[in-house]
Amino acid sequence: MSKKLTFQEIILTLQQYWNDQGCMLMQAYDNEKGAGTMSPYTFLRAIGPEPWNAAYVEPSRRPADGRYGENPNRLYQHHQFQVVMKPSPSNIQELYLASLEKLGINPLEHDIRFVEDNWENPSTGSAGLGWEVWLDGMEITQFTYFQQVGGLATSPVTAEVTYGLERLASYIQEVDSVYDIEWAPGVKYGEIFLQPEYEHSKYSFEISDQDMLLENFEKFEKEASRALEEGLVHPAYDYVLKCSHTFNLLDARGAVSVTERAGYIARIRNLARVVAKTFVAERKKLGFPLLDEATRAILLAEDDE
């Protein structure tokens, strides 16, 4: 490995690379979420027949993973670089390996393994065939071919590549703690994120108002349903994301039992499924505008028969 890229240079390099492969560069979605997969740029766009190629950085919050900034590798919030390509290119793995070369990682000089790890997200009714990518014994990426999203079978299949940016940067910069990662020249990761990490951990585990969170979950659930009754997919999905994050806060606080946990997940999943079905129906009303004319004509004609 030659130059040790800063965290922001890693992002810029991946953005330029995937832009060159035909991906749109999206921006992080402005609602809390546990993974880049939950962004509407993946969750909604992975369903239906329209093509979609996008790449974006997604800050991902997982309250139960907070460790007050005392653990060098486990975080309340981490950053994912998300790539979604639909339909999936036949050479997606080769494209991924080439992206590592752009980061200064020569696949011929390192032990890179694709370890089978099929993926499932019960709260959104999503699943797919997947692999973890291990670089010299450390997981740096999750590869997934979506088979189902929001309870709907995917056709065409979407390929998702999710880089764990903190892990990747730790490897490239050869540091043992994420807080020692150089974000930009002269600025360490910890100088930006250590204090928020501590505060969010303290809030999630000790301070959050359980009664308020329980009440908020009910309100967000009702508002999502109300928006769906009007066919308003995106506002509804925003409230699904709010339900998910609120549940994660309750879970971190130990406010839900094992039985209740399954019930909350089912409620979020049911909403996500309705959002998915409504999104495809609304795109159909628009004539699936991202399809080429020939494919659009065939699909719409089939539906008219």
Swiss-Prot record:
Pfam families: tRNA-synt_2e. Its EC number is 6.1.1.14. It is found in: Cytoplasm. Gene3D superfamilies: Bira Bifunctional Protein, Domain 2, Class II aaRS and biotin synthetases, domain 2. One of its GO terms (cellular component) is cytosol. GO terms for molecular function: ATP binding; catalytic activity, acting on a protein; glycine-tRNA ligase activity; transferase activity. Keywords: Aminoacyl-tRNA synthetase, ATP-binding, Cytoplasm, Ligase, Nucleotide-binding, Protein biosynthesis. GO terms for biological process: glycyl-tRNA aminoacylation. It catalyses: tRNA(Gly) + glycine + ATP = glycyl-tRNA(Gly) + AMP + diphosphate. PANTHER family: GLYCINE--TRNA LIGASE, CHLOROPLASTIC_MITOCHONDRIAL 2 (PTHR30075:SF2), GLYCYL-TRNA SYNTHETASE (PTHR30075). Belongs to the class-II aminoacyl-tRNA synthetase family. Tetramer of two alpha and two beta subunits. This is Glycine--tRNA ligase alpha subunit. It comes from Streptococcus pyogenes serotype M1.
